Amino acid sequence: MKSFFKPLILKKFLWTLLFVFIYVLGSKLTLPFVDVSSIAKLNGDSVTLNYAAALMGGNLRSMSFFSIGLAPWMSSILIWQMFTVSKRLGLNKLSMESQEKRRMLLTLAIALIQSLGLVLNLPLKTVAGVGQGTIVFLDTLILIAGTYFLIWLTDLNSSMGLGGSIMIVMVSMISYIPQDIWLSIQELKISPLILALIGFFSLCFLYLAVLVERAKYRIPINKINIHNRFKKYSYLDIRVNAAGGLPIMYAMTLVSIPQYFLMLLLFFQPNNRLLKEGILSLAMGGIPWFILYLLTIFILAWAFAFINVNSDQIAERMQRSGEYIENLYPGEATRRYIHKTVGYFAFVGALYLVLVAGLPMLLIFLDIRYMRLGMIPGMFMIFIGMVFSIKDEVDTLTLNDRYHSLF
């Protein structure tokens, strides 16, 4: 806690407060030409999109400038990372400037699909002298501009504040999701006893989630020609859940993209029955959505594990620095061992996330109103990962302050 009151941390925290204020202010500015009183249901199927937007700094409840949030940008980063893992594509050989341009173009494509699909299904007001096409174009442009403004705000927070994009997402989650959970409790008329049990099990799960989040498997590392009493403290750490809670957050967003795309197609073919059924099946509560959601979490958890712990880079770095694992040759043998170990924990972590996010969501098949309560474990996983990420950043920034001068 003392680290928080260091001048550097306080300065960064004040900058973050300013950026959060700008974000909150922008999220209150409603899109022009939109009938706010008629957007509550967003064509009757907004639950999935609402949660996906909230998990990425967006807000579909008030249809503001930041309604789609950082979803296009964060989705493009994920897609790009998954492609750069493969050496065959050679994307990691491109210059940083070229990679950034391609990521931004991918962000633009995703933002265009989401913005256009959203605007075309909004209840728009008719204004004298302004055509429907002009209104759609302007609102789509504003939503895309809002996304790029948030990207810029995130970059500023990364360099001047704390948490980077995490702070925007955390504020979005805190602003809307607890309120939704409380409304569900009131709507379902849950008794105080059941509510107390939910609170107790939530605390137990919170404790378990923190343990899993910080749990690590340590591989002893030796260095050539270095023998000292500190040798036993040299390890390669692999987290048990290397992906953290990110797969749950990204899964909700990626699963919502097909729904945006179908909404876009439905505007041009309003009587297409297949499109309407597709939108309904991809809404929360449907079996296709549930299967796709869990499958996406599993795949992302597996992918994130290999992205976060790249066996090729680790083996190459160890070989250059003269490090080796006991009874293993440096190079290919070391790479295979690390890859196999990461694969094992990737499977364990993916299975853990699927159980944590999937089992509580089975409640929605009893009553869709349980959906918000079923999301609580997943929200805990996401939030815990964000909190520890900020804590690690603060610890890194104050690392030098832990050492004192001898004179």
UniProtKB/Swiss-Prot annotation:
GO terms for biological process: intracellular protein transmembrane transport; protein targeting. Keywords: Cell membrane, Membrane, Protein transport, Translocation, Transmembrane, Transmembrane helix, Transport. It comes from Streptococcus gordonii. The central subunit of a protein translocation channel (Potential). Part of the accessory SecA2/SecY2 system specifically required to export GspB, a serine-rich repeat cell wall protein encoded upstream in the same operon. The chain crosses the membrane at residues 13-33, 65-85, 104-124, 133-153, 158-178, 192-212, 248-268, 287-307, 345-365, 370-390. May form heterotrimers with SecE and SecG subunits (Potential). Component of the accessory SecA2/SecY2 protein translocase complex required to export cell wall protein GspB. The keyword Hydrolase does not apply. The gene is secY2. It holds the Pfam family SecY. Disulfide bonds: none annotated. InterPro entries: SecY/SEC61-alpha, SecY2, SecY_dom_sf. PANTHER family: SECY/SEC61-ALPHA FAMILY MEMBER (PTHR10906). It is a multi-pass membrane protein. Belongs to the SecY/SEC61-alpha family. SecY2 subfamily. Coiled coil: none annotated. GO terms for cellular component: plasma membrane. This is Accessory Sec system protein translocase subunit SecY2. Disruption phenotype: Loss of adherence to human platelet cells, loss of export of cell wall protein GspB; GspB accumulates in the cytoplasm. It is found in: Cell membrane.
